[in-house]
């Protein structure tokens, strides 16, 4: 019987049944890598869920950013309410890694703000992987970064049950070893408090606390309690408590690690002194000795991950521990939006290494800090068992490695791909003006992509002079303002949005009936086959969707993008005719305007006192933290940008 139970009001439709059947059969036949190529809106996530249920194995779902990962996490939680659906992304609301700028002799210390809720979810993910076999972890690229060894992490669990003979002192010692700290006043995750023979523990992965009541050296009763009010939720017979941090090691291993770190330190100091670098020698000696004292005293130090090679007992160049090591041997990895996520995985190692080289060269870190790193791409691929690449535009890498590719071209809504039209570049601006006016007459919106920021601004100015309600969008506009502009387009406050790279906005706007691609024959990143197909897809949410590509030369990218779109459109129209389906535009509610109204209320800064601004900032910070806790990162980003603007005032 399957461990995964998929709940949905829908059954697979269109291309979904065929795609699910093909993928599952090939995986069961031993195929390692496959690709699901599905157009926007074809229900790829539902197909992924069906594959997980039928393969019946733990699954890692990777996405290229936190917001998309949060959306997938929510969808999979709805599909699999009986199973462990977990979320593993970076727990930093804000993160400035330590760095050194040699030109100005400036050391930038690590600065971060940890999101406690995401930290809880990260621990929940690792604990589920070690205790259950019905786990789905939705993750960003964070899953390839170093965390502690799963063996050490599992070794430090504390199992408590009623009638167990154990003294109060022994329980407290174990909790301290597991990096829990005592705090009898403030009670938060990763802490415990003691009142006589009653110990209350707030597990790192929980929204509740545990109350252990002892009778002498025996556990009398265990309760799950409300952490804030202390009310009893239920009585428990047995509990398993996991460490408060992912980096935990036994005392003996720690002593060996410290000895090896000191040995490396001596070699590094000698090297610096031999080359006359006395400042660097003093710096590395002082910093490392301070960390070692902290380790010996409390078993932890700030930046402990930089000593992970020694802590884990790894050799130079050996693959570091990451979330992947917590999965069993037989698991599935689904890489969503693989055309973006795969290159992102590739790039993590080199970027991390370049920053560390500077820190090591100038005596801020030991050379072994380089071994606290994300996985190299070859290490990531070696760690895989079976992989599913998912994208509307899979890249050559995915297609080249996949033994089977399945297509999802039919949308459940019956929507077909927009009609692609190629026109000459001559008079493209005025030709497009006529098309925009037609759309405005039909209460439709228009997206226009230009090659440069200057062109986007000039084009917008020209169209405004021609009485078109137009706005532009590019990378210099803040996150807050970008989101507001997109919402205003949907509401009809203006009709035409001009941008450079509209792909980065994640624009799926049902109101957009025309997408115009200017200078479509200028080969490059934004006019590649993949980018053109992705841009064309921006008009695929409207039943009247069209795309105009302005090009004098039919490049391979233009030809392939147009041919692929026409091919899909032909299949979709034939399917609709055969099944008597009438296409209908996607209907999507506009977002809640409460935040926008709050921002509007405080636009007139000149009329507000400094104290009032401080109060507004406090209120917005509270809302920002709640939004991040709720995994609503778009809302959190808007609030963060507004807070920064207010602080500048």
Curated annotation (Swiss-Prot):
Keywords: ATP-binding, Cytoplasm, DNA damage, DNA excision, DNA repair, Excision nuclease, Helicase, Hydrolase, Nucleotide-binding, SOS response. ATP binds at residues 38-45. Its main location: cytoplasm. GO terms for cellular component: cytoplasm; excinuclease repair complex. Residues 614-649 form the UVR domain. Pfam families: Helicase_C (PF00271), ResIII (PF04851), UVR (PF02151), UvrB (PF12344), UvrB_inter (PF17757). Residues 428-594 form the Helicase C-terminal domain. It is found in: Cytoplasm. A motif (Beta-hairpin) lies at residues 91-114. GO terms for biological process: nucleotide-excision repair; SOS response. Residues 25-178 form the Helicase ATP-binding domain. One of its GO terms (molecular function) is ATP hydrolysis activity. The beta-hairpin motif is involved in DNA binding. Forms a heterotetramer with UvrA during the search for lesions. Interacts with UvrC in an incision complex. The UvrABC repair system catalyzes the recognition and processing of DNA lesions. A damage recognition complex composed of 2 UvrA and 2 UvrB subunits scans DNA for abnormalities. Upon binding of the UvrA(2)B(2) complex to a putative damaged site, the DNA wraps around one UvrB monomer. DNA wrap is dependent on ATP binding by UvrB and probably causes local melting of the DNA helix, facilitating insertion of UvrB beta-hairpin between the DNA strands. Then UvrB probes one DNA strand for the presence of a lesion. Belongs to the UvrB family. This is UvrABC system protein B. The lineage of its organism: Archaea, Methanobacteriati, Methanobacteriota, Methanomada group, Methanobacteria.
């Amino acid at each position: 019987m399957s461990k995964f139970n998929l709940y949905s009001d829908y059954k697979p439709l269109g291309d979904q049944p065929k795609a699910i059947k093909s993928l599952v059969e090939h995986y069961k036949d031993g195929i390692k890598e496959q690709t699901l190529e599905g157009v926007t809106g074809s229900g790829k996530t539902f197909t992924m869920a069906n594959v997980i249920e039928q393969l019946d194995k733990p699954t890692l779902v990777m996405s290229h950013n936190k917001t998309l990962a949060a959306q997938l996490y929510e969808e999979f939680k709805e599909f699999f309410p009986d199973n462990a659906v977990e979320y593993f992304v970076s727990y930093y609301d804000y993160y400035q890694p330590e760095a050194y700028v040699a030109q100005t002799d400036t050391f930038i210390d690590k600065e971060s703000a940890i999101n406690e809720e995401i930290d809880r979810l990260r621990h929940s993910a690792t604990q589920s992987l070690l205790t259950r076999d019905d786990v789905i972890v939705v993750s960003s690229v964070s899953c390839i970064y170093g965390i502690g060894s799963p063996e050490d992490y599992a070794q430090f669990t504390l199992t408590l049950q009623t009638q167990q003979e154990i003294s109060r002192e022994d329980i407290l010692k174990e909790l301290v070893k597991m990096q829990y700290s005592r705090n009898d006043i403030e009670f938060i995750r990763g802490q415990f408090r003691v009142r006589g023979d009653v110990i209350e523990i707030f597990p790192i992965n929980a929204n509740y606390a545990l109350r252990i009541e002892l009778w002498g050296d025996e556990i009398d009763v265990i309760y799950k309690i409300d952490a804030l009010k202390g009310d009893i939720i239920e009585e428990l017979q047995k509990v398993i408590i996991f460490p408060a941090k992912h980096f935990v090691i036994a005392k003996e291993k720690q002593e060996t690690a410290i000895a090896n770190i000191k040995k490396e330190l001596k070699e590094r100091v000698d090297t610096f002194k031999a080359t006359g670098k006395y400042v660097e020698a003093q710096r590395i000696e002082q910093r490392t000795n301070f960390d070692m004292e902290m380790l010996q005293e409390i078993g932890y130090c700030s930046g402990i991950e930089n000593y992970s090679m020694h802590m884990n007992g790894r050799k130079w160049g050996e693959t570091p521990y990451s979330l992947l090591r917590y999965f069993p041997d037989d698991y599935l990895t689904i890489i969503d939006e693989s055309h973006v996520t795969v290159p992102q995985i590739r790039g993590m190692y080199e970027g991390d290494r370049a920053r560390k080289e500077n820190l090591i060269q100038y005596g801020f870190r030991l050379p072994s800090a380089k071994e606290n790193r994300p996985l190299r791409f070859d290490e990531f691929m070696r760690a895989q068992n079976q992989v599913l690449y998912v994208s509307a535009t899979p890249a050559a890498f995915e297609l080249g490695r996949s033994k089977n590719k399945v297509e999802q071209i039919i949308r459940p809504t019956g929507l077909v791909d927009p009609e692609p039209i190629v026109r000459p570049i001559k008079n493209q601006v005025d030709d497009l003006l006529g098309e925009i006016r037609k759309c405005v007459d039909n209460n439709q919106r228009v997206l226009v992509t230009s090659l440069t920021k200057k062109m986007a601004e000039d084009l917008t100015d020209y169209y405004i002079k021609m009485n078109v309600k137009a706005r532009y969008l590019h990378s210099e506009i803040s996150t807050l303002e970008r989101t507001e502009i997109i919402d205003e387009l949907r509401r009809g406050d203006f009709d035409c949005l001009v941008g450079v790279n509209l792909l980065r906005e994640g624009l799926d706007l049902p109101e957009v009936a025309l997408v115009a691609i200017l200078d479509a024959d200028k080969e490059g990143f934004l006019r590649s086959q993949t980018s053109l197909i992705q841009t064309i897809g921006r008009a695929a949410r409207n039943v009247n969707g069209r795309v105009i590509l302005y090009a004098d030369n039919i490049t391979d990218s233009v030809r392939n993008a147009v041919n692929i779109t026409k091919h899909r459109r032909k299949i979709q129209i034939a399917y609709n005719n055969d099944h008597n389906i009438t296409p209908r535009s996607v209907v999507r509610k506009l977002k809640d305007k409460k935040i926008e109204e709050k921002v509007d209320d405080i636009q007139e800064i000149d009329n507000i006192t400094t104290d009032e601004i401080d109060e507004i900032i406090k209120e917005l910070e509270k809302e920002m933290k709640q939004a991040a806790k709720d995994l609503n990162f778009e809302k959190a980003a808007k609030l963060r940008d507004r807070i920064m603007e207010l602080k500048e005032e």
